Curated annotation (Swiss-Prot):
Pathway: Amino-acid biosynthesis; L-proline biosynthesis; L-glutamate 5-semialdehyde from L-glutamate: step 1/2. Substrate binds at residues 54, 141, 153. This is Glutamate 5-kinase. Residues 280-358 form the PUA domain. The lineage of its organism: Bacteria, Pseudomonadati, Pseudomonadota, Betaproteobacteria, Burkholderiales. InterPro entries: AceGlu_kinase-like_sf (IPR036393), Asp/Glu/Uridylate_kinase (IPR001048), G5K_ProB (IPR041739), Glu/AcGlu_kinase (IPR001057), Glu_5kinase (IPR011529), Glu_5kinase/COase_Synthase (IPR005715), Glutamate_5-kinase_CS (IPR019797), PUA (IPR002478). The keyword Chloroplast does not apply. PANTHER family: GLUTAMATE 5-KINASE, ISOPENTENYL PHOSPHATE KINASE. One of its GO terms (cellular component) is cytosol. Belongs to the glutamate 5-kinase family. One of its GO terms (molecular function) is RNA binding.
Length: 372
């Protein structure tokens, strides 16, 4: 089996905290130097690379003399602010040794949820790549809140892959890849060499959480691969402990788990809707509506809605949940939650008699609806 990275030109590489720190006690300068050298080798092959790097909070903890990761958000943000300075400096120094300039970009979900800022971020990243710069991206932990944070850099890496229409996302971790079960508990567990991104059985295999230093377990990596597939990006989950792992992947060696994007690439606007707009509420839909959305490519009509949950305004994103509780789609609603509660289970022809007006016959038009 040949590595999918060999034929990929535009890469997003995500490096976890454990691979750039001394067991959480500050940055591992030598390790960062090795990552810079490998990325320089990829650049020499004509590949474009965007790096998503953890490590700011761990470095901040070291500089502040803290041995345990704080729980209070203000202390985490303070550690991130202190540590981000050191992280950027070390990367700049190590890449300069190879004649490569770097750029620091800090993002929040709010940056990408706003369409204009999303397009600006995309334009900036593409310009940096055109100029031969390696963008180094992290979540802006200093200002982020629970409502607008990505939650982990695996998710951020996937969103960046979507943003720049990357060919592949490489998630480097301290694990060898995805196993059929937890290899620490099940001696019969085997490595999943290749699978389809988004295959439902992968989430069951992924299981538990990550370490206390980082925020991402294997499940977040599987979900990140599913998200990256929205734009057609394949994903590799591999051990960053493997010597020259990036160079070997680029050379065609199959390492870790390859998750292939089999689904059709989403249109850019729908991809943005699916990835970056915050869900404000939910509607439960019947089996007939699920069938029409998933197989028929139809709009969601009020008659197919059986329940309305949460408070949302017209034009906000709501999730469509089937009778089994699984989300099947999300989209921009034409009616508020208060209006939807009045018109759900009713034919579109009765909307005007119930509300006194009819904005649209659909609750969500198919052009504003994305299957998930």
């Amino acid at each position: 089996m040949r590595s999918i990275i060999a034929d990929s030109k535009r890469l997003v590489v995500k490096v976890g905290s454990s691979l750039v720190t001394n067991d959480g006690k500050g940055l591992d300068h030598a390790a960062i130097g090795r990552w810079a050298a490998q990325i320089a080798a990829l650049r020499a092959q004509g590949k474009e690379v965007v790096l998503v790097s953890s490590g700011a909070i761990a470095e901040g903890m070291q500089r502040l003399g803290w041995s345990k990761r704080p729980r209070e958000i203000d202390e985490l943000q303070a550690a991130a602010a202190v540590g981000q300075m050191g992280l950027a400096q070390v990367y700049e120094s190590r890449f300069t040794e190879h004649g490569i300039r770097t750029a620091q970009i800090l993002l929040t979900h709010a940056d990408l949820a706003d369409r204009e800022r999303y397009l600006n971020a995309r334009s900036t990243l593409l310009t940096l790549l055109r100029l031969g710069v390696v963008p180094i991206i992290n979540e802006n932990d200093t200002v982020v809140t629970d409502e607008i944070k990505f939650g982990d850099n695996d998710t951020l890496g996937a969103l960046v892959a979507n943003l720049i229409e990357g060919d592949a996302l490489i998630i480097l971790t301290d694990q060898s890849g995805l196993f059929t079960a937890d290899p620490r508990k099940d001696p019969a567990a085997t490595l999943v060499a290749e699978a389809n991104a988004g295959a439902p059985e992968l989430e069951a295999m992924a299981g538990g959480a990550g370490s206390s230093l980082g925020r991402g377990g294997m499940l977040t990596k599987i979900l990140a691969a599913k998200r990256a597939a929205h734009s057609g990006a394949n994903t590799v989950i591999a051990s960053g402990r493997e010597p020259d792992v990036l160079v070997r992947l680029a050379g065609g060696e199959a390492i870790g788990t390859q998750l292939i994007a089999r689904t059709a690439r989403m249109a850019a606007r729908k991809q943005w809707m699916a990835d970056h707009l915050q869900v404000r509420g939910h509607v439960v839909i019947d089996a007939g509506a699920v069938e029409k959305l998933t197989a028929g490519g139809k709009s969601l009509l009020p008659i197919g809605v059986t329940d309305v949950q949460g408070a949302f305004a017209r034009g906000e994103v709501i999730a469509c949940v089937g009778p089994d509780g699984r989300e099947v789609a999300r989209g921009l609603t034409n009616y508020s939650s208060a209006e939807t509660k009045l018109i759900h289970r009713k034919p579109s022809g009765e909307i005007e008699s119930v509300l006194g007006y009819m904005l649209e016959p659909e609750l969500i038009h198919r052009d504003n609806l994305v299957l998930v």
